């Protein structure tokens, strides 16, 4: 829903503002102590509403960066991953949901600066990871602009 890393899902705090669903998420980069929160948009607002994402109950929550415990979360995430595999297509991994969000940002023509902020990584990482999707997205966007310009002539 929000493109969070599996280590970040316990910190997701969904909220609604101006009719849009967002979340505040603790950014947890690999091998780093988390200190920063970011704001992320639910790209599929209809899904967020259908899943009642504003009312999700979690078995564990992180409300402050100081509450982050890597060992405890690894244990919880392992349990969650096993449950997820049993309930879904075994080939689908929780991290695939993060990548789907990343590709969706390209398909929705969200610029790489904004998309990388939503996902909590650098613009360079975002651009290189989702380059193919952005290449196609950029081509489609350019074609649409050309078509609009030709129609206005």
Residue ranges of each PLM-predicted region?
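Intrinsically disordered, low-complexity basic tails/linkers immediately adjacent to helix-turn-helix/homeobox/MYB/SANT
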Residues: 144-153
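Active-site-proximal segment of tyrosine recombinases
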Residues: 8-9, 92-93, 102, 110-120
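Conserved tyrosine-mediated DNA breakage-rejoining catalytic core shared by Y-recombinases
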Residues: 4-7, 11-49
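Catalytic-site neighborhood detector that most strongly recognizes the C-terminal catalytic loop/helix
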Residues: 27-32, 119-144
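Short, polar N-cap/turn motifs at the start of nucleic acid-interacting alpha helices
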Residues: 15-21, 110-129
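Active-site/catalytic core of tyrosine-dependent DNA strand-transfer enzymes
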Residues: 40-91, 95-96, 101
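Short helix-to-turn junction characteristic of helix-turn-helix DNA-binding domains
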Residues: 12, 105-106
């Amino acid at each position: 829903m929000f493109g969070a890393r599996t280590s970040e899902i316990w910190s997701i705090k969904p909220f609604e503002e101006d009719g849009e669903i967002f979340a505040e998420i603790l950014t947890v980069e690999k091998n780093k102590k988390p200190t920063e929160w970011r704001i992320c948009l639910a790209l599929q607002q209809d899904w967020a509403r259908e899943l009642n994402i504003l009312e999700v109950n979690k078995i564990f929550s992180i409300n402050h960066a100081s509450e982050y415990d890597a060992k405890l979360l690894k244990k919880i995430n392992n349990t969650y991953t096993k449950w997820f595999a049993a309930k879904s297509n075994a080939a689908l991994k929780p991290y695939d949901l993060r990548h789907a969000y990343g590709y969706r940002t390209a398909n929705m023509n969200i610029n790489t600066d904004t998309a990388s902020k939503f996902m909590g990584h650098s613009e360079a990482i975002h651009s290189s990871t989702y380059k193919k999707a952005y290449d196609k997205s950029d081509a489609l966007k350019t074609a649409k602009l050309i078509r609009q310009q030709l129609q206005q002539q």
